[in-house]
Amino acid sequence: ILHVPYPIEVNDSPVICNRMFTHDDFAKIITDQFDQMLDLSQRQPLIMGIALHTFVVGQPFRLLALRRALEHMLRHRDIGKVWLTRPGTIADYAMQLPKGIVPGS
């Protein structure tokens, strides 16, 4: 079993619906988390998850803030520092690594 982390803190549903943060607050959470993890990733590879739900951040009035956060991350992808992908693609990649790289393989 391969587990790709599901984020509780960088998750639009509890942040916006339960804690009543604004969509701009959520976008700042995304970029702050990203910037800090980018710095930490200089020492070891890291995975950053963002949980998005269409009924929350997918609402048109919230999309602009999300777009700004994603564009911030894309600038780093375009210079080869990050890989933006989906959990299934990470799982496929991990399963193709040499035996012993992934614990339990």
What spans do the regions from the language model cover?
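Active-site-adjacent pocket scaffolds in enzyme catalytic domains
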Residues: 1-44, 103
